[in-house]
């Protein structure tokens, strides 16, 4: 059945070339909405801890199913939010833009359902090409070329050690199937080979998350990318690193309880704290949201390295919740940029008086971003905090201060953008469009559904 989703994306790309120009945007949204519905139907019964083999190389389980659904769910939302870019593009440019989003969605479906390490690596690298095109072609400023260079350098060259590790695994185990490799190396792998695999592979995953210290490409890419690129990058592409760590963590189990693992947990939690402090100092709205993603993903990486059931469940919950919240924040920031022409918080103040209904969406998303009850972010952060304290109680001050600063910059986003007197240059802005309320509502709807029944996936995992 996973082949159905992949073939559907191929059909979407083909149909995009044939749709009349006056129906291109609506047709693309309709097709991507059908893909979202199809993913919910196909993956409805896959919330169990075991693999659901759909072919010899594709499968889904508790880890991959929510991320696949999230990828399909955000595709139509990204197109809805990209109406401004499509209006300013030619007919050919609009078709290429839509096809790039479809290609990224299809590649993500294969990535999250891949059973082969080499297929996983190839498809992850494939997602870089359309993302680079979105950044360099539809970026807002001339710095987009430099942002694309940073993006390719960090993600492409950072993942080359993973290819070396995959070759070493194949030589050692004669198999690249993820379940087989987990069994073979977890039982028969030497400490030296496992340590080498650890050192080589986490560099790739740290770049993709990214954690603090490997993050220099992310703010540049987010600031220069179009709204669809920022939404997909923050919501899905950053989760590939966390997914890879969660999927292959069994390879690390024999050396997990040592100083290296604890050092990485301390490194990730300390990075989350430093990033939260950096967020408080930001004046650019998109850069602030981008740095907040680095902080959240650093906490996710620390939880995965704890290798506890609570840590894994909290990491998965926070990845899904952060994907929805960060995507919504970037789309709302784009609505401000389209009206004011700037992302500086000092200029975009007083929006509550100009766009009163949008203030509600800003309030809900900022509250979810800081982990206000009963948001899924809070549930994930509680599980992660519990797992980290079980490793060392001395991690509590670091994570605690990171959460405090996270609350500060989340409230700062809302206060600086919505409160105060509007700047004179943005007083005569046009009112909100219905499509803007639509994509904001489509972001908050899954969060509400997770709030209603947050533990269904976690109970299935524990079983």
Swiss-Prot record:
InterPro entries: NADH4_N, NADH_Q_OxRdtase_chainM/4, NADH_UbQ_OxRdtase, ND/Mrp_TM. The chain crosses the membrane at residues 24-44, 62-82, 98-118, 119-139, 151-171, 198-218, 232-252, 260-280, 285-305, 310-330, 353-373, 404-424, 442-462. It is a multi-pass membrane protein. Belongs to the complex I subunit 4 family. This is NADH-ubiquinone oxidoreductase chain 4. One of its GO terms (molecular function) is ubiquinone binding. Keywords: Electron transport, Membrane, Mitochondrion, NAD, Respiratory chain, Translocase, Transmembrane, Transmembrane helix, Transport, Ubiquinone. Its EC number is 7.1.1.2. Its main location: mitochondrion. GO terms for cellular component: mitochondrial membrane; respiratory chain complex I. It comes from Strongylocentrotus purpuratus (Purple sea urchin). It is found in: Mitochondrion membrane. Core subunit of the mitochondrial membrane respiratory chain NADH dehydrogenase (Complex I) that is believed to belong to the minimal assembly required for catalysis. Complex I functions in the transfer of electrons from NADH to the respiratory chain. The immediate electron acceptor for the enzyme is believed to be ubiquinone. The keyword Transmembrane applies. PANTHER family: NADH-UBIQUINONE OXIDOREDUCTASE CHAIN 4. GO terms for biological process: aerobic respiration; ATP synthesis coupled electron transport; electron transport coupled proton transport. It catalyses: a ubiquinone + NADH + 5 H(+)(in) = a ubiquinol + NAD(+) + 4 H(+)(out). It comes from the Eukaryota.
């Amino acid at each position: 059945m996973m082949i159905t989703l992949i073939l559907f994306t191929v059909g979407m790309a083909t149909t995009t070339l044939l749709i009349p120009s006056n129906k291109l945007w609506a047709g693309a949204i309709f097709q991507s909405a059908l893909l979202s519905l199809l993913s919910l139907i196909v993956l409805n019964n896959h919330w169990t801890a075991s693999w659901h083999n759909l072919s010899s190389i594709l499968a889904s389980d508790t880890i991959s199913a929510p991320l696949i659904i999230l990828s399909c769910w955000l595709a139509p939302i990204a197109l809805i939010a990209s109406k401004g870019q499509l209006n300013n593009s030619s007919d050919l440019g609009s078709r290429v833009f839509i096809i790039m989003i479809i290609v990224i969605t299809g590649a993500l479906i294969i990535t999250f359902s891949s059973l082969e390490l080499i297929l996983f690596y190839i498809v992850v690298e494939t997602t870089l090409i359309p993302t680079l095109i979105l950044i360099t072609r539809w970026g807002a400023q001339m710095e987009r070329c430099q942002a694309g260079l940073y993006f390719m350098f960090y993600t492409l060259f950072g993942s080359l050690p993973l290819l070396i590790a995959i070759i070493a695994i194949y030589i050692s185990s004669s198999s690249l199937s993820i379940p087989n490799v987990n069994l073979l190396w977890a039982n028969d792998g030497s400490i030296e080979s496992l340590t080498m695999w650890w050192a080589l592979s986490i560099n790739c995953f740290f770049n993709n998350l990214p954690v603090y210290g490997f993050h220099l490409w992310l703010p540049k890419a987010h600031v220069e990318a179009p709204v669809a690129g920022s939404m997909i990058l923050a919501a899905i592409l950053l989760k590939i690193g966390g997914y890879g760590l969660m999927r292959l963590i069994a390879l690390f189990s024999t050396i997990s309880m040592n100083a290296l693992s604890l050092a990485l947990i301390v490194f990730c939690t300390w990075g989350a704290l430093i990033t939260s402090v950096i967020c408080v100092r930001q004046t650019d709205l998109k850069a602030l949201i981008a740095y907040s993603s680095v902080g959240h993903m650093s906490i996710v990486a620390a939880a995965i390295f704890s290798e506890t059931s609570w840590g894994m469940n909290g990491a998965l919950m926070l990845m899904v919740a952060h994907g929805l919240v960060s995507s919504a924040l970037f789309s709302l920031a784009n609505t401000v940029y389209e009206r004011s022409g700037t992302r500086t918080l000092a200029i975009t103040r007083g929006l509550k008086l100009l766009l009163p209904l949008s203030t509600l969406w800003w309030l809900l998303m900022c509250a979810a971003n800081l982990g206000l009850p009963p948001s899924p972010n809070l549930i994930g952060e509680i599980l992660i905090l519990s797992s980290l304290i079980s490793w060392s109680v001395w991690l509590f001050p670091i994570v605690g201060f990171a959460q405090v600063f996270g609350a500060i910059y989340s409230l700062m986003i809302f206060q600086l953008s919505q409160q105060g007197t509007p700047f004179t240059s943005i007083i005569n802005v046009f009112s909100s469009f219905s499509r803007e309320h639509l994509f904001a509502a489509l972001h908050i709807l899954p969060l509400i559904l997770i709030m209603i029944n947050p533990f269904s996936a976690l109970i299935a995992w524990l079983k």
